[in-house]
């Protein structure tokens, strides 16, 4: 998908119901996949996180509910960080989690991070992600050797201590970090692909990062922030 159309930097797009009829195109083929018992991966530069118009975020939430079990995984970049977003059922009072966006850090290392790539492992039948490995090339090592050397940084399931990446699993993992400061600091280290000093992100920074991970819709995210005074 070309989700850059929905980017906040494109104000002319905001009032449009379906720019370039992309939503209709996506739903057409998701309906086809559902009818034929097929699985789908969505790939785009930008996820339905902080940087797209709210109306399109709402569409993503509804789409992932409607085609739950069809969209096995979705992959994004844009933020230059290593993280996730949790999509939820907006018709559910408790905001049931329905889909996880996998957001990969960037190869060029902008934003104070090291260059990074992910190697995904998936189930051949369900097409769900079962694990992934992150590799980084550290700038401080390149400064000495003048070479780009990719080294294994972490295995996701082992690093996070999770059995899978199902939405409910990821919510439990994220919410654990409200109390487990060591786990949160480790998350920030992987978030910044190793270029992070323990204790840099605390208080307001921690609350905003966790609420952004847990809630995509602005109203829900602001409620989350209000419930966790720093």
Q: Model regions: which residues?
A:
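Metal-dependent phosphoesterase/phosphodiesterase active-site architecture
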Residues: 2-32, 36, 81-230
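Active-site-proximal segments of metal-dependent phosphoesterases and phosphodiesterases across multiple
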Residues: 5-24, 31-79
């Amino acid at each position: 998908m070309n989700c850059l159309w929905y980017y906040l930097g494109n104000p002319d797009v905001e009032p449009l119901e379906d720019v370039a009829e992309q939503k209709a195109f996506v739903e057409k083929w998701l309906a086809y996949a559902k009818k034929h018992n097929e699985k789908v991966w969505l790939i785009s530069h930008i996820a339905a996180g902080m940087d797209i118009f709210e109306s399109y975020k709402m569409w993503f939430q509804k789409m992932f509910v409607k085609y739950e079990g069809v969209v096995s995984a979705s992959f994004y970049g844009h933020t230059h960080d290593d993280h996730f977003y949790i999509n939820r059922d907006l018709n559910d009072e408790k905001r049931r989690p329905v889909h996880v966006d996998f957001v990969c850090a960037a190869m060029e290392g902008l934003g104070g991070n090291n260059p990074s790539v992910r190697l995904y492992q998936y189930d051949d039948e369900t097409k769900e992600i079962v694990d992934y490995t992150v590799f980084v090339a550290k700038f401080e090592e390149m400064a000495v050797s003048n070479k780009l050397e990719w080294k294994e940084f972490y295995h996701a399931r082992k690093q996070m201590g999770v059995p899978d990446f199902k939405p409910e699993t990821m919510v439990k993992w994220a919410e654990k970090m409200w109390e487990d400061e060591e786990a949160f600091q480790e998350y920030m280290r992987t978030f910044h692909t190793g270029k992070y000093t323990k204790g840099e992100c605390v208080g307001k920074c921690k609350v905003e990062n966790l609420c952004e991970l847990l809630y995509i819709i602005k109203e829900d995210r602001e409620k989350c922030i209000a419930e966790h005074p720093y």
